[in-house]
A protein has these predicted regions:
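Conserved glycine-rich cofactor-binding loop
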Residues: 12
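Conserved NAD(P)H cofactor-binding loop of Rossmann-fold oxidoreductase domains
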Residues: 79-85
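Substrate-binding pocket helix/loop in short-chain dehydrogenase/reductase
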Residues: 87-88, 92-100
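Active-site helix of classical SDR
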Residues: 111, 146
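Residue(s) in the substrate-gating loop at a strand-loop-helix junction
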Residues: 130
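Active-site-adjacent segment of SDR/Rossmann-fold oxidoreductases
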Residues: 135, 156-165
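C-terminal helical subdomain
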Residues: 163, 169-170, 177, 186-224
């Protein structure tokens, strides 16, 4: 990753911080995009931008700023997203709209906005799907459906950009985060996917070592 520019969305969450920190440690210039910029930035000299990724115009402008500041964009890691547990019978339409906006629309907007820059560098996109989108449990409908959309976006865009931009996705089970621990206090946290380990997989897919890998939906299950 030495000398490359890596854009991380959802960059101030647990996984985003892990990815941004590891990318910087590998020598990349890092741009951290999130709905709000926090003062406790884990990456010195990172470009930090507050942007509403559900808005294509705002996302396009953010990519322009990154390209202008660094001279290139080599990889985009789409981590921005959200989760809700809600049954169809007792839930509401707003939750479905929110999941599709946070999980699928952000991935689409970021990918579309970055494509002109990624084509210049023969770059890579790495999305975050979900194992739950392969086999959804009760209450997971809105979340799983939106993540299934991320899977199909990944596959379709990989075909469209074949030979120009690589597009892959990781499909984690449960990521070990403070909110997940709070929501599932009786679970065995030791079986969950560590953010640092998932970051390594994502940065491999973004790197030249994965130059022949595109259109892949890669499960990262931990020991769940």
């Amino acid at each position: 990753m030495q000398g490359k520019t890596v854009v991380v969305t959802g960059a101030f969450g647990t996984l985003g911080r892990a990815v941004a920190g590891l990318a910087a440690a590998k020598g990349a210039k890092v741009a951290m995009l999130d709905v709000a910029v926090r003062p406790d930035n884990p990456v010195r000299d990172a470009i930090a931008l507050a942007v509403d990724l559900t808005k294509l115009d705002a996302t396009t402008e953010a990519m322009r700023k990154v390209r202008e500041a660094t001279g290139r964009i080599d990889a985009v890691l789409n981590i921005a997203g959200g989760f809700v547990w809600q049954t169809v019978a007792e839930g509401d339409e707003a939750a479905w709209e929110r999941m599709f906006a946070l999980n699928l629309k952000t991935a689409y907007n970021t990918s579309r906005a970055a494509l002109p820059h990624l084509i210049e560098t023969s770059g890579a996109i790495v999305n975050v799907g979900a194992n739950a989108a392969l086999n959804a449990g009760a209450g997971m409908g809105a979340y799983a459906a939106s993540k299934a959309g991320v899977h199909r976006l990944t596959e379709s865009l990989a075909q469209e950009m074949k030979g120009r931009v690589r597009v892959n996705a990781v499909l984690p089970s449960i990521i070990d985060t403070a909110p997940n621990r709070a929501d599932m206090p009786k679970a065995d946290f030791s079986t969950w996917v560590k953010a640092e380990d998932l970051a390594k997989v994502m940065l491999f897919l973004a790197s030249d070592d994965a130059r022949d890998v595109t259109g892949v939906l890669l499960p990262v299950m931990g020991r769940v």
